[in-house]
Amino acid sequence: MARRSVLYFILLNALINKGQACFCDHYAWTQWTSCSKTCNSGTQSRHRQIVVDKYYQENFCEQICSKQETRECNWQRCPINCLLGDFGPWSDCDPCVEKQSKVRSVLRPSQFGGQPCTEPLVAFQPCIPSKLCKIEEADCKNKFRCDSGRCIARKLECNGENDCGDNSDERDCGRTKAVCTRKYNPIPSVQLMGNGFHFLAGEPRGEVLDNSFTGGICKTVKSSRTSNPYRVPANLENVGFEVQTAEDDLKTDFYKDLTSLGHNENQQGSFSSQGGSSFSVPIFYSSKRSENINHNSAFKQAIQASHKKDSSFIRIHKVMKVLNFTTKAKDLHLSDVFLKALNHLPLEYNSALYSRIFDDFGTHYFTSGSLGGVYDLLYQFSSEELKNSGLTEEEAKHCVRIETKKRVLFVKKTKVEHRCTTNKLSEKHEGSFIQGAEKSISLIRGGRSEYAAALAWEKGSSGLEEKTFSEWLESVKENPAVIDFELAPIVDLVRNIPCAVTKRNNLRKALQEYAAKFDPCQCAPCPNNGRPTLSGTECLCVCQSGTYGENCEKQSPDYKSNAVDGHWGCWSSWSTCDATYKRSRTRECNNPVPQRGGKRCEGEKRQEEDCTFSIMENNGQPCINDDEEMKEVDLPEIEADSGCPQPVPPENGFIRNEKQLYSVGEDVEISCLTGFETVGYQYFRCLPDGTWRQGDVECQRRECIKPVVQEVLTITPFQRLYRIGESIELTCPKGFVVAGPSRYTCQGNSWTPPISNSLTCEKDTLTKLRGHCQLGQKQSGSECICMSPEEDCSHHSEDLCVFDTDSNDYFTSPACKFLAEKCLNNQQLHFLHIGSCQDGHQLEWGLERTRLSSNSTKKESCGYDTCYDWEKCSASTSKCVCLLPPQCFKGGNQLYCVKMGSSTSEKTLNICEVGTIRCANRKMEILHPGKCLA
């Protein structure tokens, strides 16, 4: 053995001496340079201090040692400070509330640790109105009017109960008749069922339904916990008491990251109103189908905890119900405070005043649900420690459930699994798997706050006392929360008040604007595919599994993905109403765009809705009450002994002097809608037999409607209607070209050529192929060579009108093919104009210009074209622009004898002057080349 070791040492020493290598650290590094950026990933470098000495040369240090190193630095994102816009002008003084307001918007939320916005966004001030308030008192008809203006049934007057809310229905009553034979207590916490709910904040708001109102009906319900029944309010359809505390309904969920815990911001839910209409709002609330904490403080706390390390989460929750309830579908009694707020809304739309309704009362109300409590904890675990524990996700969930049953609920005969106490994570904490968690976030709802706080787990705590959970459970019965609920829009409650229809429409408009303020589209993209979420005026980053850090900028060692999922940018403003009386808005999947295999945005890219407009003179918002909201319906037919019923007008036409019945011999006039014109005889005459004498008449379109194209395309000029002969140009973003013709002309009632619905943009391969070369050339290594018309021009390029001097004919050619052939010294091809060849002045001038060009002394390349003596090249458009005659040079060899206009005299002009006059389309006859003889 010793001999073998000596032999090994001798061989090793011989090898080292034979191939000596450079010890690079013999030459020290300089200090790292300053970072090139203070944030957003800069670079810094250092250099090796080389001394070219004998050692350096003999040991091949030049080949072995690296001389410079570079590394990333300051990779944290630059802070984005919150930015507010300027206040707009004061609104008009509203005559109904005698207030005016001014608003400003959040131009940019804070992000990545930037300064937050703390200043108010709305300012109000009292004012003296110059107009009269159009809001009239509600007509109670045969009902009793309360002092507050509320209308209630006559039978509720003098019944010993405060049905008006201001006790005006019990004033000056002689004798009262009680509704119930005895007094009943209200259902405990019944007022919670009448609260509004803010779907964006995920929390209850002010009272919208008055659940102390019983409507003169003595309806009771009994609980198994008490001997005395409770009085059921008029707003509730039914109530059922129950207490659910089953031990086997403890549920656990595993989350690799928080993105799946909060709802996707693109999800939409449609809420139908009682009036039959519906509108869509984002779902950010908890219901029977979804549990979401996206916008409350607990979710923010969870996000901040996940920033500290790569984390996974286990959520354990249990629902305890005290009672279930269902709200009536109609005839709901509003709370006094909500009714007063609605009555004080102005008639004219004011975004600031209408938005306050949602701040104070939420956006929805409860249509059904339960009162009770939810035991709900979210445990944060280190992803690395969970992985090293050896447990699967299902096993980890099971261990949390078992330990909660034993140490929180104190369920007897709980069998503890061996793997839950002997895994690597539990062994560090005396057999407790939960003690291995980094943190817990309490999502507990219901019960007394001190008992709920006692249930929250803290790292290193000794555990709960046996009575803690049972004390909280008992307190839930007295202090419940609304859980497992369903919602309807608060706008549906705005009924049976003065100007109800007008105010409902204003609230719907305000809700759309209000919801847009909570859209995370305003946030900048988060690093490592994090999902941005907007909390107030601050953007937070929800980290994907395998990432962490204040802004998700750090990666765990096993994080390999570099995909970037797409997120929606913000919606554009609504377009103006087009000829079909619709308007639209769009958004782009560009915040960021999907990259490296990332997911595309889900949801609609374009929204369209009908326009609302008035056919009468605009004198401000009309006061429309519920009973005045009429729609156009077919009027009942009127029977008469003589005359003619209303005739049917042609498509896209209407009767100017419209009525139900016309006398014998009376004429009606047919008119056409905007954009159409009458063709034929436009008068009908009523005959004695009750029929109409009418000739052929129709409404033909005399304008083209703005075409519907893909959102990526831009239409220039952008108009609602285009007259016959007008053209549009379709363009794409930089780096893309239209995958088809780009120029279209309105001819008759349609576009020529027809515009395909599938027309879109494609990558500008021509520009990419060209590189830094001239038009018609492509880059081949460091050289520029001519493109091949056959190989390089298979993709679409715009049409050009081209003249071939060999065949003495003109034709339409793709731009790529024309440029390639021109580059290959095909001099017989001449550019005439952009677009397909069509008869007209543009083609005539192009042909004449080509004939003149043969004598031009100047030939300057300019885009597709070549500029001649009478032209200059525009740097901004790459097109030839004609000079004015005074700008031409004097004299020259190329002279012409011409006659100007109707003049009989002859005049000698040079080629530049001739070209400028013909370019201006002025009349001129060329008599012969050369000077005039006389």
UniProtKB/Swiss-Prot annotation:
CCP 2: region residues: 689-765
Residues that bind Ca(2+): 156, 159, 161, 163, 169-170
Highest taxon above the source species: Eukaryota
Spans through the membrane: 278-290, 402-415
Intrachain disulfide bonds: 22-61, 24-65, 35-73, 39-78, 82-117, 93-127, 96-133, 140-151, 146-164, 158-173, 180-218, 399-420, 499-623, 521-570, 523-539, 526-541, 543-552, 577-611, 589-601, 644-686, 672-699, 704-746, 732-761, 773-823, 784-801, 786-837, 793-816, 862-873, 867-919, 880-897, 882-932, 888-912
Signal peptide interval: 1-21
Limits of the LDL-receptor class A domain: 138-175
Pfam entry (one): Kazal_C6
InterPro entries according to UniProt: C6_KAZAL, C8A_B_C6_EGF-like, FacI_MAC, Kazal_dom, LDL_receptor-like_sf, LDLR_class-A_CS, LDrepeatLR_classA_rpt, MAC_perforin
SMART domains: CCP, FIMAC, LDLa, MACPF, TSP1
Protein role: Component of the membrane attack complex (MAC), a multiprotein complex activated by the complement cascade, which inserts into a target cell membrane and forms a pore, leading to target cell membrane rupture and cell lysis. The MAC is initiated by proteolytic cleavage of C5 into complement C5b in response to the classical, alternative, lectin and GZMK complement pathways. The complement pathways consist in a cascade of proteins that leads to phagocytosis and breakdown of pathogens and signaling that strengthens the adaptive immune system.
Name of this chain's protein: Complement component C6
Species: Pan troglodytes (Chimpanzee)
